[in-house]
Amino acid sequence: MDPVVIFLVLAFPIASVYLLFYHKKRVGGLSSPPGPRGLPFIGNFFQLYKAPCIHEYLWNLSKKYGSLMTLHMGSVPILVVSSPKMAKEVLKTQDLIYCSRPRMTGMRKLSYDGLDVAFSTYSEHWRHVRKLCTLELFTQKRAQLCFRLVHEQEVSRMIVRLSETAAASKDVNAFECFSNLSTSIISRVAFGKRYDEDGIGKERLQRMLSEIDAMLAGIFVSDFFPMFGWIDRLSGMRARLDRTFKEMDMFYEELIDEHLKPNRPESPTEDLIDVMLKNKGSSCLLTMDSIKAILLNVFNGGTGTSATLLVWAMTALMRNQGVMKKAQEDIRRVIGRKGNVDEDDIQNLSYLRAVVKETMRLYPTGPLLIPRETMESSIIGEDKDHMYMIKPKTLVYVSMWAIGRDPEIWKNPMEFVPERFLERPDLNYKGQQFEYIPFGAGRRICAGIHLGVTTVELALANLLYTFDWEPPAGTRFEDIDDETLNGLTLQKKNALYIRPKKYICP
């Protein structure tokens, strides 16, 4: 049974008692930012739970309450940030106060109690792991020596499979196609194997990744109402989390054991497990559990986001045929009869790169950045007449969904217009300009930006160079929607099916 339903049934009598006897006292000094009124004890829990899409719901609320908005999930205060100015305050000016992470049940369990880089609280261990990621795992040198070869080989394999599909006049499930690509790339980069070959079961891996995503995004009653934590066990959520962790731990344990075998065949390039095992001997902070936790970040962060971004890019292009045609003409003009696009070509494809940037603006893979948690009290506000007090242990969500749709920042924000990024070539995703931070900013900016963006740019360039694209038989371009689902990543509600048609270069 749904744990939230159980909780609401049990909490209703308590909320009723609060309504009879609870009286809010006026507190001197600065107040919290405004926000929708919630029920005593429960707060805004029910409102958030019943929202079809939380990012849409919070965006609409921000239009009423402003760029700083307060909600409550039980006793836990939540701050929603919806403007570049306030995002800069949180992610840069006061980053040291706002740079920790909440200890949410799903994230804590699957990250081996916060031994990773994405979900860990701010600590000496996090600083060490972050340094490992930036100086060893995701360096420019490694990108050239290892990542490039993998990218180009796996994109080429995808194009071959799609050519067979085109010859048979069949439709393609875009997410399945792009998920296969990104999972193959990440698995080769991380542990030196293609996920659907070499004995690694495709079905097992996809099932595990799906469960991990569900548990990371899942609502655990104990996170917001500790006294009702037993509901997580009664509902089966805790048992499901434990099963997911056990399966994940076994999977990563097998991979690490293979790398530790003395008779393991030598590879011309190191994968990420090789690098971490080498660094493990020189640091007491890097344990086997730390390595597994980092693999969680690399695998779940790298596979789902790249595939999702490619789906949204193709969705936007199918819905905007003029943009599709312009992108194809530009790519085919630059590449000519070469036969494929490689990484060296990407720098010369300015319109393609603008398409990817515009996709990340209108359809950010993380509509709400991974929540932060304040480590101490903070004073923040748009101006001196609107200053607010933010309490310690406040959950902080920066809404990329709201910022990317703000008409005061973007002209015609609901339209897909890559040209806006050609007019501002300085606008990038490296966390410097706070009207556009799809990968976050500050200490917590994504460490694997280059790996993810290169995957998307190279794949999309080859998709547009090699094929023309049509909707399935019996449907029109106008039938393709852009409805979204709830979740940590911005998933498309209705699967995108498209039909490739091989382009013959004149």
Swiss-Prot record:
GO terms for molecular function: heme binding; iron ion binding; monooxygenase activity; oxidoreductase activity, acting on paired donors, with incorporation or reduction of molecular oxygen. GO terms for biological process: coumarin biosynthetic process; response to wounding. The chain crosses the membrane at residues 3-23. The keyword Heme applies. Induction: Accumulates in roots after wounding. It is a single-pass membrane protein. Heme binds at residue 446. It comes from the Eukaryota. It is an enzyme of class 1 (oxidoreductase). Disulfide bonds: none annotated. The record marks 118, 301, 305 as: Substrate specificity. Its EC number is 1.14.14.-. Pathway: Secondary metabolite biosynthesis. Belongs to the cytochrome P450 family. Involved in the biosynthesis of coumarins and furanocoumarins (FCs), natural products required for defense responses against attacks by predators with potential medical and agroindustrial usages such as anticoagulant, rodenticide and artificial vanilla substitutes. Catalyzes the conversion of xanthotoxin into 5-hydroxyxanthotoxin. This is 5-OH-xanthotoxin synthase. It comes from Pastinaca sativa. The lineage of its organism: Eukaryota, Viridiplantae, Streptophyta, Embryophyta, Tracheophyta.
